[in-house]
Structures are given as structure tokens and as C-alpha cells.
A protein has these predicted regions:
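N-terminal Rossmann NAD(P)H-binding glycine-rich loop of SDR-like oxidoreductase domains
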Residues: 1-23
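N-terminal Rossmann-fold cofactor-binding loop
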Residues: 29-40, 55, 77-78
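Catalytic helix-loop patch of NAD(P)-dependent Rossmann-fold dehydrogenases
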Residues: 92-104, 124-167, 172
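Mid/C-terminal beta-alpha module of Rossmann-like enzyme folds, strongest
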Residues: 213, 220-266, 271-272
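C-terminal amphipathic/interface module of NAD(P)-dependent oxidoreductases
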Residues: 268-287
Length: 287
């Protein structure tokens, strides 16, 4: 089986490529840079086949996908800077990547009868209540530009393809790229106290584990919508920060605050990022 992976310079795409290498599967990575520019740690992705690809260029998307001719595309590339997405000058760029780029990939997959696995987010929901969001729930109500763009990407994939997986994830962290864990480790070195919100609830998800799931999933025909997070229950960002400092031995004091008290974000965040993963388990997948 041959897999094309978008966004391999990011934290999830990086780990997906390395997981594919473990399976000895034929894989081609792509990103906007001329060559791979992710973290250099001696992992397989550094020497695996790579294609420069601007997913906002429809002609280029079709040219690359037709030439590589994969059996499946794992689409990890996305605009993920949630606050920057709110800037008026950035909105067209966000939608070009997350909506148009996703649509072009879906159309190209259809043209060669390839599967597509699209990475989405809990941000397609409004975060109200406390019940975990189910994968087949259609009560979409994004609170921000990023969430709306990812939802529109979902709708593009599901309207164009029949052979698709839409996997919503939340609170992702990994070795490559920027994430909450790295931010806490950096800030913890220079601050004796730190304010972290305690009223947004979700589940941290390690890209290493997520990559293993995605590679397993894409080899099946169990198409549909899924929610994928690590085990361990639901926690707040405050809880997560406390555990990070506990594990690393930092003595940084973490002060719990509400989202309103924190008040620094341009984009609204959902309070309830709990994702129900029972469907994932019922279909024989593990994370």
C-alpha cells in the first residue's frame, strides 16, 4: 500500500511518516518547503521520499497526487494557529489551506480512486455542556475561524468522497512542532508562577500514539467519523500543566484561572472538548 502524507514538517505528519516506516510501507511526504524541514533527530522521515506541495494550488495538488498515485492520502497539513486565524488579513489564508486545499485533495483522491483520511478537531463543536461529543453528532457550531474552516473541510471531504475517514482530535502534542507541553517547559524555566485556565476540559493526545492509530485505520475500509484521544480521562489545562511540571521536577507554581480571567486569547475556545471514542474502540481500533 502506498501512502501520501501532507504536512510532514508538522508534529503529526512527522510521526505518521515514521510510523509508516515501521510498517515498511511505501510512503511519500509533502510540505510547502523545497525539502523536509522538520526536526532532525535521525528518524526515518528525514530520508523518506518528499514532494514540495502547496495544497492551495489545485493544479499542483492534482499533478502531485496523479504522479505519486497513492492508495490513500493522510491529510495532516492545516493552518492551526487559532488566534492568528482571527486576524482579518489571515482569514482568506486560513480558508485557502483548511477548506480549499482539503477540497482539492479530496477531488484528486476521487480522480484516482484513493482513500482519504482527514484530520479534524473538537473545535467544530461549540463546547457547551459536559457530555462528551460523539463522532456522528451533527450539532456543529464552531466558535472561531479555525473551527469553521476545519468544519468546512470536513463537509468538502464527505460531499466529494465515499472512501473517507474523518478523525477529530484534541489537545495534541508531539516532539516536532509547537504545542502546550513545549510552551509549559519553556515558560516554566523562566517563571516562578504561571496562570493556566481550569475551565476548559479535554484529553491530551500524543502524536506518536495517534500516528499508530491512523496508519492502522487507513489500511482498512472502516470509513466514517471518529474521535481519537489518549486514555486517562478528562482534565483541564491547569491539570495538564501541573502534571507536566510534576514529571519534569519544575517547582513552578501553577495558578488556576477561568477563561474569562485569563483573557488573552483572540479566538474563543470551547469549554467542553471531551470527545467520545467508543465508536473507535467498537470498530477494533486502539489508542
Amino acid at each position: 500500500m502506498k501512502i501520501l502524507v501532507t504536512g510532514v514538517n508538522g508534529q503529526l505528519g512527522h510521526d505518521v511518516m515514521n510510523e509508516l516506516a515501521k510498517w515498511n510501507m511505501e510512503a511519500v511526504g509533502c510540505g510547502t518547503s523545497p525539502v523536509y524541514k522538520g526536526i532532525r533527530n535521525g528518524s526515518p522521515v528525514e530520508s523518506m521520499p518528499y514532494e514540495q506541495l502547496d495544497i492551495t494550488d489545485r493544479n499542483q495538488v492534482f499533478e502531485v497526487i496523479r504522479r505519486v498515485h497513492p492508495d490513500a492520502v493522510i491529510h495532516c497539513a492545516a493552518w492551526t494557529a487559532v488566534d492568528a486565524a482571527e486576524e482579518p488579513e489571515n482569514i482568506p489564508k486560513v480558508r485557502a489551506v483548511n477548506v480549499d486545499g482539503t477540497k482539492y485533495i479530496a477531488e484528486a483522491c476521487k480522480a484516482i480512486d484513493a482513500k482519504m483520511l482527514y484530520i479534524s478537531t473538537d473545535y467544530v463543536f461549540n463546547g457547551e455542556g459536559t457530555a462528551p461529543w460523539e463522532p456522528d453528532c451533527r450539532d456543529f457550531a464552531p466558535l472561531n475561524v479555525y473551527g469553521q474552516s476545519k468544519l468546512d473541510g470536513e463537509l468538502a471531504v464527505s460531499s466529494i468522497l465515499q472512501k473517507f475517514f474523518i478523525v477529530r482530535i484534541a489537545w495534541v502534542f508531539g516532539i516536532n512542532g509547537n504545542n502546550f507541553v513545549k510552551t509549559m517547559l519553556k515558560v516554566g524555566k523562566t517563571h516562578s508562577t504561571l496562570r493556566v485556565v481550569d475551565d476548559q476540559i479535554g484529553t491530551p493526545t500524543y502524536t506518536f500514539d495517534l500516528a499508530r492509530l491512523l496508519v492502522d485505520m487507513v489500511q482498512t475500509d472502516k470509513y466514517g467519523y471518529y474521535h481519537a484521544t489518549n486514555e486517562g480521562g478528562y482534565i483541564s489545562w491547569y491539570d495538564f500543566a501541573c502534571e507536566i511540571f510534576k514529571q519534569t521536577g519544575y517547582d513552578t507554581q501553577v495558578i488556576p484561572v477561568t477563561t474569562e480571567e485569563y483573557g488573552l486569547s483572540k479566538a474563543k475556545r470551547p469549554y467542553n472538548s471531551r470527545l467520545d471514542k467508543i465508536k473507535l474502540l467498537k470498530r477494533g481500533f486502539n489508542l
